[in-house]
Amino acid sequence: MRNITSFFKTFLLWELLKGMKVTGKHFFTRKVTVQYPDEKTPISNRFRGLHALRRYENGEERCIACKLCEVVCPALAITINSTEREDGSRRTSSYEIDLFKCIFCGYCEESCPVDSIVETNILEYHFEERGENIMTKAKLLAIGDKYEAQIAADRLQDKDFR
């Protein structure tokens, strides 16, 4: 009896028919593919995208040059140089992030004591020239100024988890 069932399963391609049954069952269901440039899926407020530097309400940059983000970065993508002011406080003279090295882990954002460096939910960006992958302090501050309302809203929504 065992040989007969084995014979029918082999010559009738039983495994192939079982696979085709699964394919046929899912053939008429709703598709889950998104046509990316035209359609976009919703992005979480915790998404880790392009970096930005924030300012205080009075316009002064938040970064105090503590260099915690530079130390905690596992990819060594952040470089900070600082200068001391007349009042004794430190501020950054240069702040650079190499986006080719960055792995977007979010450690820089978590380690910042003054909430200066943040990762926005900017997903789409490109480079046309060599060297544009280095995000300078001016570029990071410009991104922060442009998207401050969105960054603040995401922070407010996520405050219970920080």
Curated annotation (Swiss-Prot):
Q: Where in the cell is it found?
A: Cell inner membrane
The protein's organism comes out as: Francisella philomiragia subsp. philomiragia (strain ATCC 25017 / CCUG 19701 / FSC 153 / O#319-036)
Which reaction(s) are listed as its catalytic activity?
A: a quinone + NADH + 5 H(+)(in) = a quinol + NAD(+) + 4 H(+)(out)
Q: Which gene encodes it?
A: nuoI
Q: Which domain of life is it from?
A: Bacteria
Membrane-protein topology? Peripheral membrane protein
Q: Which GO terms describe its cellular component?
A: plasma membrane
Q: What does this protein do?
A: NDH-1 shuttles electrons from NADH, via FMN and iron-sulfur (Fe-S) centers, to quinones in the respiratory chain. The immediate electron acceptor for the enzyme in this species is believed to be ubiquinone. Couples the redox reaction to proton translocation (for every two electrons transferred, four hydrogen ions are translocated across the cytoplasmic membrane), and thus conserves the redox energy in a proton gradient.
Q: Which residues form the 4Fe-4S ferredoxin-type domain?
A: 54-83, 93-122
Q: What is its EC number?
A: 7.1.1.-
**Annotated binding of [4Fe-4S] cluster 1, by residue:** 63, 66, 69, 112
Family, per entry: Belongs to the complex I 23 kDa subunit family.
Q: Transmembrane stretches, by residue range?
A: none
Name any one GO molecular function: quinone binding
Give the UniProt keywords, A-Z: 4Fe-4S, Cell inner membrane, Cell membrane, Iron, Iron-sulfur, Membrane, Metal-binding, NAD, Quinone, Repeat, Translocase, Ubiquinone
GO biological process terms, alphabetically, are: aerobic respiration
- Per UniProt, [4Fe-4S] cluster 2 binds at 73, 102, 105, 108
- Kindly give the Gene3D superfamilies that the UniProt entry links to this protein: 3.30.70.3270
**Protein name as catalogued:** NADH-quinone oxidoreductase subunit I
Query: SUPFAM superfamilies, alphabetically?
Result: 4Fe-4S ferredoxins
Subunit details for this protein?
Answer: NDH-1 is composed of 14 different subunits. Subunits NuoA, H, J, K, L, M, N constitute the membrane sector of the complex.
NCBIfam families noted in UniProt = NuoI, PRK05888.1-4
Cofactor binding annotation: Binds 2 [4Fe-4S] clusters per subunit.
Which prosthetic group or cofactor does it need? Answer: [4Fe-4S] cluster
